[in-house]
Amino acid sequence: MIRIVHVNDEVLAPLRARYGSPVDLEWSGEISEREHALATYNPDRTHDVTLFILDPVDRIALIRKPHFALGIWRPPGGGIKPGEDFALGAEREALEETGLRARLERYLVATHASFVFESQTLAWQTHVFSARTSDTVLAPHDTDEIAGARWGTLPELAGPLRERLLATGHALWRYRVALHDAALRALRE
């Protein structure tokens, strides 16, 4: 399968100039058949953007998708469409998944991952940004994809939510934990 990468250095260079240089993270792990199906459901997509959206009192927006196990929440995010301005696409994803109007602040983490399933290796990128909103009401627009949204705290993401993700035993949740850990470290710097 040939996968087109439209989030490339040409797209990312202006983001680094505007939002700062991110921490680079490499990650590799074996994924299950179910995780492979999730990672390849859109064969043209090879990336996601994850948003650490903070409100005026530094709460973080968290979302839950219908297929998440009970108690699993994570920061929102999604894909940038081919030809779409990256920052506008990230803001669109924030609105769709949380109902929040958010503005990007910092480019926290750029991850290059290899998801291994049987004899296949799937290359994936995740770009993590912090964003700010003055909105306080969470109301997801895309209710087919998002089962719920709520406010959490950074210590909650680093503690109980992290432990729940790891307890699933799933590689893609371990990947999310690595992203969250790197982003939380970058936010403290």
Task: Label every PLM stretch briefly.
Residues 1-7, 70-71, 143-189:
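Nudix hydrolase/Nudix homology domain
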Residues 2-50:
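Acidic, metal-coordinating catalytic segment for phosphate/diphosphate chemistry
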Residues 3-10, 18, 30-31, 57-63, ...:
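Short low-complexity stretches enriched in small and charged residues
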Residues 5-10, 43-51, 84-88, 114-117, ...:
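Short, mixed-charge, low-aromatic patches
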Residues 29-75, 102, 106:
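N-terminal strand-loop-strand
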Residues 51-52, 129-136, 182-189:
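A short, hydrophobic secondary-structure junction motif
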Residues 80-103, 111-166:
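Unchanged
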